[in-house]
Design a protein with these regions (language model features):
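Eukaryotic partner-binding/assembly regions in large regulatory complexes
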Residues: 1-89, 104, 116
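Minor-groove-contacting beta-hairpin "wing" of winged helix-turn-helix DNA-binding domains
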Residues: 158-164
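Short acidic, hydrophobic short linear motifs in intrinsically disordered regions
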Residues: 29-33, 112-126, 185
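Short helix->loop/beta-hairpin flanking segments within DNA-binding domains
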Residues: 104-115, 180-183
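Short amphipathic alpha-helical interaction segments
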Residues: 45-50, 132-147
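Short, amphipathic alpha-helical interaction segments positioned at domain boundaries
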Residues: 165-185
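Short helix-coil junctions and helix-kink-helix linkers
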Residues: 35-44, 123-134
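A short, conserved structural fragment
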Residues: 147-157
Length: 185
């Protein structure tokens, strides 16, 4: 039997950011998460699912104790677009192994080509998650989150490309990002 997918709703990066800020300030609650979710979804079932996902992406995230310990560095990093992309991607990947597995697949293909198709990702992910019917739905939740975070682009429907940050264009970091992208994430 394959792994479980675990995510079935897209959560806006802005919502994750607000939830993390509330959690770091000590004012996060289940009701706060429900209020955030109600801004994105209608209906009690969808709001409850989203509330659970928001909690998992913020206060119940395995990275939260580390971020809480390094709160000042976190706030400084959130001011830089490239750092934000890595932070949000890390939060998603730490909370959901599906996100991590999708990122590994993307990284392997970005290592050798500039574009990756949705169908290619689905084919590779089905070897991990079997022919789970929730696989395409989960991918359509995770990929827009990566796009909104600023990690990847979608130049056309079903095609994804890496994001290059100008701050890295003339530094050795750009070489590392181009050649070892799948290791970094």
């Amino acid at each position: 039997m394959g792994k479980t997918v675990g995510i079935n709703q897209r959560i806006s990066i802005n919502v994750i950011e607000m939830a993390m800020k509330a959690a770091l300030e000590g004012c996060y609650s289940s009701e706060f998460a429900a209020d955030l979710a109600s801004g994105e979804y209608e209906g009690s079932n969808r709001i409850n699912k989203a509330r659970s996902i928001i909690g998992r992406l913020s206060i119940r995230n395995p990275l939260f104790p580390f971020i809480e310990e390094h709160k000042n560095e976190y706030y400084v990093a959130m001011k830089h677009k490239s750092d934000r992309a890595i932070i949000f991607t890390s939060l998603i990947n730490a909370a959901y192994s599906f996100g991590y597995d999708a990122m590994v697949v993307l990284g392997k293909f970005f290592h050798v080509q500039d574009e990756v198709s949705t169908q290619l990702i689905l084919n590779k992910m089905s070897s991990i998650y079997a022919s789970n019917r929730s696989l395409p739905n989960a991918l359509y939740c995770i990929m827009p989150m990566y796009i909104e975070a600023g990690l990847i682009n979608r130049p056309k429907t079903g095609i994804y490309t890496k994001v290059y940050y100008e701050a890295f264009l003339h530094l050795p970091v750009n070489y590392i990002l181009n050649h070892f992208w799948f290791i970094i994430i």
